[in-house]
Amino acid sequence: MKVFITGGTGLVGSAVVAELVAAGHTVTALSRSVSSAERAEAAGVTPLRGSLTDLEVLRAGAERAEGVIHLAFGNDFSSPEAIARDVTEEAEALAALAGPLIGTGRPLVTVAGTPVAPGRASTEEDPLPTEGPVGGRSESVARVLALAPRGVRAAAVRLPRTVHHDGRGGFAGLLTEHARRTGVARNTRAAGRRGAAAPP
Protein backbone atom coordinates (compact mmCIF):
# COMPACT_ATOMS: atom_id res chain seq x y z
CA MET A 1 0.00 0.00 0.00
CA LYS A 2 1.16 3.55 -0.72
CA VAL A 3 0.88 5.51 2.53
CA PHE A 4 1.25 9.25 3.07
CA ILE A 5 2.07 10.21 6.65
CA THR A 6 2.41 13.50 8.48
CA GLY A 7 4.61 13.51 11.56
CA GLY A 8 6.47 10.48 10.22
CA THR A 9 9.77 11.45 11.81
CA GLY A 10 8.28 12.34 15.19
CA LEU A 11 8.13 10.18 18.28
CA VAL A 12 5.01 8.18 17.38
CA GLY A 13 5.44 8.61 13.64
CA SER A 14 8.91 7.10 13.50
CA ALA A 15 7.57 3.95 15.22
CA VAL A 16 4.62 3.81 12.79
CA VAL A 17 6.94 4.30 9.80
CA ALA A 18 9.20 1.48 10.98
CA GLU A 19 6.18 -0.85 11.17
CA LEU A 20 4.90 0.22 7.74
CA VAL A 21 8.28 -0.24 6.05
CA ALA A 22 8.81 -3.62 7.75
CA ALA A 23 5.40 -4.72 6.42
CA GLY A 24 6.44 -3.79 2.86
CA HIS A 25 4.40 -0.61 2.41
CA THR A 26 5.64 2.31 0.33
CA VAL A 27 5.68 5.39 2.53
CA THR A 28 5.90 9.10 1.76
CA ALA A 29 6.45 11.35 4.78
CA LEU A 30 5.71 15.06 5.01
CA SER A 31 9.04 16.67 5.91
CA ARG A 32 9.16 20.30 6.98
CA SER A 33 12.96 20.58 7.18
CA VAL A 34 16.11 19.22 5.59
CA SER A 35 16.91 17.25 8.74
CA SER A 36 13.40 15.76 8.79
CA ALA A 37 13.76 14.78 5.12
CA GLU A 38 17.12 13.15 5.89
CA ARG A 39 15.59 11.18 8.78
CA ALA A 40 12.74 10.08 6.51
CA GLU A 41 15.16 8.86 3.86
CA ALA A 42 17.24 7.06 6.49
CA ALA A 43 14.06 5.27 7.61
CA GLY A 44 13.46 4.06 4.06
CA VAL A 45 10.68 6.44 3.07
CA THR A 46 10.32 9.20 0.50
CA PRO A 47 10.20 12.72 1.95
CA LEU A 48 7.70 15.25 0.62
CA ARG A 49 8.84 18.72 1.60
CA GLY A 50 6.22 20.89 3.23
CA SER A 51 4.48 21.66 6.49
CA LEU A 52 0.96 21.44 7.87
CA THR A 53 0.28 24.91 6.48
CA ASP A 54 1.14 23.83 2.90
CA LEU A 55 -2.37 22.69 2.08
CA GLU A 56 -1.69 22.02 -1.61
CA VAL A 57 1.26 19.79 -0.68
CA LEU A 58 -0.99 17.90 1.74
CA ARG A 59 -3.69 17.46 -0.90
CA ALA A 60 -1.13 16.22 -3.42
CA GLY A 61 0.30 13.73 -0.93
CA ALA A 62 -3.17 12.41 -0.09
CA GLU A 63 -4.18 12.26 -3.75
CA ARG A 64 -1.24 9.98 -4.62
CA ALA A 65 -1.69 7.73 -1.56
CA GLU A 66 -3.81 4.67 -0.98
CA GLY A 67 -4.04 5.60 2.68
CA VAL A 68 -3.20 8.60 4.88
CA ILE A 69 -2.00 8.73 8.48
CA HIS A 70 -1.99 12.10 10.25
CA LEU A 71 0.27 12.33 13.33
CA ALA A 72 1.78 15.83 13.10
CA PHE A 73 0.91 18.66 15.47
CA GLY A 74 2.61 22.00 16.08
CA ASN A 75 3.25 21.29 19.77
CA ASP A 76 3.80 24.95 20.66
CA PHE A 77 2.35 25.16 24.16
CA SER A 78 4.03 28.48 24.98
CA SER A 79 0.78 30.47 25.12
CA PRO A 80 -2.97 30.07 24.64
CA GLU A 81 -2.62 31.86 21.29
CA ALA A 82 0.07 29.43 20.14
CA ILE A 83 -2.06 26.44 21.10
CA ALA A 84 -5.09 27.91 19.31
CA ARG A 85 -2.94 28.48 16.22
CA ASP A 86 -1.73 24.85 16.26
CA VAL A 87 -5.29 23.54 16.68
CA THR A 88 -6.53 25.66 13.75
CA GLU A 89 -3.54 24.61 11.63
CA GLU A 90 -4.32 20.95 12.31
CA ALA A 91 -8.02 21.36 11.47
CA GLU A 92 -7.16 22.94 8.12
CA ALA A 93 -4.53 20.26 7.43
CA LEU A 94 -6.99 17.44 8.15
CA ALA A 95 -9.55 19.02 5.81
CA ALA A 96 -6.90 19.20 3.07
CA LEU A 97 -5.88 15.57 3.63
CA ALA A 98 -9.49 14.38 3.66
CA GLY A 99 -10.64 16.14 0.50
CA PRO A 100 -8.99 13.79 -2.03
CA LEU A 101 -10.13 10.72 -0.08
CA ILE A 102 -13.88 11.43 -0.13
CA GLY A 103 -15.72 8.76 -2.10
CA THR A 104 -12.64 6.58 -2.56
CA GLY A 105 -12.94 4.12 0.32
CA ARG A 106 -9.33 4.90 1.23
CA PRO A 107 -8.36 5.20 4.90
CA LEU A 108 -7.59 8.35 6.86
CA VAL A 109 -6.20 7.61 10.31
CA THR A 110 -5.60 10.29 12.91
CA VAL A 111 -4.96 10.25 16.64
CA ALA A 112 -6.89 11.40 19.67
CA GLY A 113 -6.07 11.59 23.32
CA THR A 114 -7.40 9.70 26.28
CA PRO A 115 -10.05 11.66 28.18
CA VAL A 116 -10.16 12.10 31.93
CA ALA A 117 -13.01 10.22 33.59
CA PRO A 118 -13.32 11.47 37.18
CA GLY A 119 -13.42 8.64 39.71
CA ARG A 120 -12.64 5.83 37.28
CA ALA A 121 -10.38 4.74 34.46
CA SER A 122 -11.43 6.13 31.09
CA THR A 123 -12.26 3.93 28.11
CA GLU A 124 -12.48 4.38 24.37
CA GLU A 125 -16.24 4.84 24.82
CA ASP A 126 -15.76 8.08 26.78
CA PRO A 127 -16.31 11.25 24.74
CA LEU A 128 -13.33 13.39 23.90
CA PRO A 129 -13.29 16.76 25.66
CA THR A 130 -14.16 19.73 23.47
CA GLU A 131 -13.43 22.30 26.17
CA GLY A 132 -10.07 23.71 27.14
CA PRO A 133 -7.03 24.77 25.15
CA VAL A 134 -6.82 21.69 22.93
CA GLY A 135 -10.55 20.92 22.79
CA GLY A 136 -10.51 21.90 19.13
CA ARG A 137 -8.41 18.82 18.41
CA SER A 138 -11.35 16.67 19.53
CA GLU A 139 -13.59 18.58 17.14
CA SER A 140 -11.13 17.84 14.32
CA VAL A 141 -11.21 14.14 15.19
CA ALA A 142 -15.02 14.20 15.18
CA ARG A 143 -14.97 15.78 11.70
CA VAL A 144 -12.63 13.03 10.46
CA LEU A 145 -14.85 10.28 11.89
CA ALA A 146 -17.91 11.94 10.32
CA LEU A 147 -16.36 11.30 6.89
CA ALA A 148 -17.17 7.57 7.06
CA PRO A 149 -20.59 7.93 5.37
CA ARG A 150 -18.87 9.95 2.63
CA GLY A 151 -16.64 7.09 1.53
CA VAL A 152 -13.58 7.60 3.74
CA ARG A 153 -12.41 4.75 5.98
CA ALA A 154 -11.95 7.14 8.88
CA ALA A 155 -10.34 6.08 12.15
CA ALA A 156 -8.92 7.72 15.25
CA VAL A 157 -6.43 5.88 17.42
CA ARG A 158 -6.62 6.98 21.05
CA LEU A 159 -3.16 7.44 22.48
CA PRO A 160 -2.44 7.48 26.20
CA ARG A 161 -1.86 10.89 27.73
CA THR A 162 1.87 10.21 27.81
CA VAL A 163 3.79 8.60 24.97
CA HIS A 164 7.52 8.35 25.51
CA HIS A 165 10.68 6.66 24.27
CA ASP A 166 13.82 6.27 26.37
CA GLY A 167 12.82 9.23 28.52
CA ARG A 168 12.22 11.46 25.51
CA GLY A 169 9.01 12.87 24.10
CA GLY A 170 5.70 13.99 25.45
CA PHE A 171 4.96 14.91 29.02
CA ALA A 172 7.17 12.09 30.34
CA GLY A 173 10.05 13.56 28.36
CA LEU A 174 9.50 16.98 29.91
CA LEU A 175 9.52 15.45 33.40
CA THR A 176 12.60 13.36 32.63
CA GLU A 177 14.48 16.34 31.23
CA HIS A 178 13.55 18.41 34.29
CA ALA A 179 14.77 15.63 36.60
CA ARG A 180 18.05 15.33 34.70
CA ARG A 181 18.57 19.08 34.79
CA THR A 182 17.60 19.69 38.43
CA GLY A 183 18.24 16.34 40.10
CA VAL A 184 14.63 16.30 41.35
CA ALA A 185 11.96 13.92 40.04
CA ARG A 186 8.40 15.12 40.55
CA ASN A 187 5.26 13.04 40.94
CA THR A 188 2.48 14.93 39.17
CA ARG A 189 -0.29 12.47 40.01
CA ALA A 190 -2.79 13.50 42.64
CA ALA A 191 -3.63 10.88 45.24
CA GLY A 192 -5.75 8.16 43.69
CA ARG A 193 -5.43 9.48 40.15
CA ARG A 194 -4.26 7.07 37.48
CA GLY A 195 -2.92 7.78 34.04
CA ALA A 196 -1.71 5.77 31.09
CA ALA A 197 1.75 5.96 29.57
CA ALA A 198 3.15 3.92 26.71
CA PRO A 199 6.05 3.75 24.28
CA PRO A 200 5.19 4.31 20.60
PLM segments and residue spans:
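Active-site segment of SDR-like NAD(P)-dependent oxidoreductases
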Residues: 75, 113-117, 160-163, 182
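Conserved Rossmann-fold NAD(P)-dependent oxidoreductase catalytic core, especially the SDR/UDP-sugar
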Residues: 26, 74, 80-81, 87-134, ...
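Conserved beta-loop-beta element that borders a ligand/cofactor-binding pocket
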Residues: 143-166
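Rossmann-fold scaffold of SDR-type NAD(P)-dependent oxidoreductases
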Residues: 6, 66-71, 110-111
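A conserved pocket-lining segment of Rossmann-fold NAD(P)-dependent short-chain dehydrogenase/reductase
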Residues: 177-198
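NAD(P)H-binding glycine-rich loop region in Rossmannoid oxidoreductase-like domains
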Residues: 31-92
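Glycine/proline-rich active-site loop of Rossmann-fold NAD(P)-dependent oxidoreductases
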Residues: 138, 164-174
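N-terminal Rossmann NAD(P)H-binding glycine-rich loop of SDR-like oxidoreductase domains
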Residues: 3-25
